């Protein structure tokens, strides 16, 4: 599966995804920092990526208006280890079909 990590997602989550065999694009290496949320979601959609973001409010709203391949809202936790564990549990439980074209929380 392919993932696009938004600017606000801790980069160490990319290492977990890569270790699990997923392709990862870091938004900060692909688009300007001032890219709009609409541009980010379109970029992910055009590349067949599930978007990982901490920006819940804006992307929940956009998901009702724009096509997407899936959005994972990363909930900030006390530690990075807890964030990695939550994402791992989501990936294990949802699988590819549960993530694609859906909105999930990790």
Regions picked out by a protein language model, each given a short descriptive name:
Residues 37, 48-61:
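Acidic, metal-binding active-site segment of PIN/NYN-like and related structure-specific nucleases
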Residues 1-3, 45-50:
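Short active-site oxyanion
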Residues 2, 6-7, 11, 15-20, ...:
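Acidic, PIN/NYN-like endoribonuclease modules and their adjacent C-terminal/linker elements
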Residues 25, 50-53, 73:
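Short, conserved beta-strand segments within well-ordered enzyme catalytic domains
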Residues 23-31:
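A short beta-strand-loop structural module common to alpha/beta enzyme folds
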């Amino acid at each position: 599966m392919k993932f696009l990590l938004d600017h606000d997602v801790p980069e160490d989550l990319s290492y977990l995804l890569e270790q699990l065999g997923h392709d990862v694009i870091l938004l900060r290496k692909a688009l300007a920092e001032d890219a709009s949320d609409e541009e980010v979601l379109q970029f992910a959609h055009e590349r067949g990526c599930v978007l990982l973001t901490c920006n819940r409010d804006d992307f929940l709203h956009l998901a009702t208006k724009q096509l997407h391949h899936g959005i994972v809202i990363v909930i900030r936790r006390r530690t990075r280890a807890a964030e990695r564990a939550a994402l791992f549990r989501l990936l294990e439980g949802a699988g590819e079909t549960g993530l694609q074209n859906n909105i999930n929380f990790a």
